[in-house]
């Protein structure tokens, strides 16, 4: 099994974020779960990759050429795949993975998470999508998503596809036990 990690290229302001990324890397390696991620040496993504690799885990980095040229590629990886674009990066990361976890991060992290979650909503895959809610980082997003449901722009069944947990072990158990709901036709002509 391999899990794709979306996370910040920054460590954030609080040490708890990097500590959680490091713990996630250790736990994945110890559970023999491969890590697929954005291929950089910096931020939370670099911390998770370093930890997984230090514990003997499989780590696959996928990075676009323009980021290699900016010298942020993790050159210490055993498997670093260089692609031509961000689109190719996301497609390959998804292809190589059996599920997705987002740690705290910025726009790129959110964009990556929302894209794979949308693919699940549309029935393009049945892989679990999850948030590791470190230090309540995603509390505001969870509240907003509940508001989106209440306002009729997201079905509760699709909201429920997103796993949100505060603890690495609990999160991995939820991912392991995830059963994708049947995707029914969600667009009705009268609503378009």
Task: Go through each PLM region and give its residues.
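A cross-family phosphate/adenosyl-ligand binding-site feature
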Residues: 1-96, 134-169, 173, 178-192
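Gly/Ser-rich helix-loop-strand patches that form or flank binding pockets
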Residues: 79, 121-124
């Amino acid at each position: 099994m391999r899990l794709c990690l979306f996370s910040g290229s920054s460590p954030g302001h609080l040490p708890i974020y990097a500590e959680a990324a490091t713990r996630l890397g250790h736990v994945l390696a110890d559970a023999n779960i491969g890590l697929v991620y954005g291929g950089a040496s910096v931020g939370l993504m670099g911390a998770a990759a370093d930890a997984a690799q230090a514990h003997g885990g499989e780590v696959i980095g996928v990075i676009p050429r323009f980021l290699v040229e900016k010298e942020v590629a993790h050159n210490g990886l055993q498997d670093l795949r260089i692609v031509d674009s961000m689109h190719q990066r996301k497609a390959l990361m998804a292809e190589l993975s059996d599920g997705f976890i987002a740690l705290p991060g910025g726009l790129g992290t959110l964009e990556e998470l929302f894209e794979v979650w949308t693919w699940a909503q549309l029935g393009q895959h049945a892989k679990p999508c999850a948030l590791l809610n470190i230090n309540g980082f995603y509390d505001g997003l969870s509240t907003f998503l509940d508001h989106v449901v209440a306002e009729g722009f997201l079905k509760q069944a699709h909201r429920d596809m997103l796993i949100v947990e505060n603890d690495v072990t609990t999160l991995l158990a939820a991912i392991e036990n995830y059963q994708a709901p049947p995707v029914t036709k969600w667009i009705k002509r009268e609503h378009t």
